[in-house]
Amino acid sequence: MLRIAVPNKGMLSEPAWAMLSEAGYTLRSNPRQLVVEDPDNDVELFYLRPLDIAVYVGMGTIDVGITGHDLLLNSGTDAQEEMNLGFGGSTFRFAAPQDSPITTLDDVEGKRVGTSFDKLVHDYLTEHGINATPIHLDGAVESSVQLGVADLIADVVSTGTTLRNAGLRIFGEPILHSEAVLIRSPRLDPQDERLERLERRLHGVLTAKRYVLMDFDIPVEKISAAVQITPGFESPTISPLHDKQWAAVRVMVPKAKVNQLMDQLYEVGARGIIVTAIQATRM
């Protein structure tokens, strides 16, 4: 069986579970379950701490896992990044007290940086020629300055509300942009059939979220103009209608552009334009 690690908690957990469920995998029914066998899909799911997933995958104990791009880099393991999963977006930023003179990266020189990502911070500072001391903390990083443990922090930021509430302000350029990723053990063949099947399913889920089916009727002489507007992935499906002067068109279009495309199609003569959600795909 393909051994898949999924986050057992945190901001990545529920979107990861939902994505796997939409891809047809069986999830745990009891929150106390740590391992779930899914013989129909030839996989085992292991519910692990997000921080540990890259370590297990890098060691080859687990074949593949879902974790954050930032967590993967901070782990320093040999786990290989396979694909972005489209959720869990965040940035990794420096933050200092509101009244602190620390306002640029150069000001970090000689300072103590509270963080849960000490390797990532160390590598970033070294790359930029800054000599500072990362202080490893497992949680509540934003409290480290007030408690006198650090002069500033480096942490994952989604909205910035937590930092502002702690009297901290973001400064400098983002250290890193991150999102959820699928990672693979270096011991697993990248062409392993089970891995390829998993990736096809996850790509299918992403496509179903980002695209919709659009159906419309169009005068035959306007088909070329309509296809220019909605070319689809390979080519639209075009079918003749009872009235030979009209044709029916079915095509996949980006969900974010639906209304603009409907307007453009209407303007070239399309009528009866209908949009339908996609439940699943294989592209």
Swiss-Prot record:
Entry keyword annotation includes Glycosyltransferase: yes
Family that this chain belongs to: Belongs to the ATP phosphoribosyltransferase family. Long subfamily.
EC number: 2.4.2.17
Organism: Bifidobacterium animalis subsp. lactis (strain AD011)
Regulation: Feedback inhibited by histidine.
Names of required cofactors: Mg(2+)
UniProt-listed InterPro entries: ATP-PRT_HisG_long, ATP_PRibTrfase_cat, ATP_PRibTrfase_CS, ATP_PRibTrfase_HisG, HisG_C, N-reg_PII-like_a/b, N-reg_PII/ATP_PRibTrfase_C
Function of the protein: Catalyzes the condensation of ATP and 5-phosphoribose 1-diphosphate to form N'-(5'-phosphoribosyl)-ATP (PR-ATP). Has a crucial role in the pathway because the rate of histidine biosynthesis seems to be controlled primarily by regulation of HisG enzymatic activity.
Protein name according to UniProt: ATP phosphoribosyltransferase
Catalytic reaction list: 1-(5-phospho-beta-D-ribosyl)-ATP + diphosphate = 5-phospho-alpha-D-ribose 1-diphosphate + ATP
Taxonomic placement: Bacteria, Bacillati, Actinomycetota, Actinomycetes, Bifidobacteriales
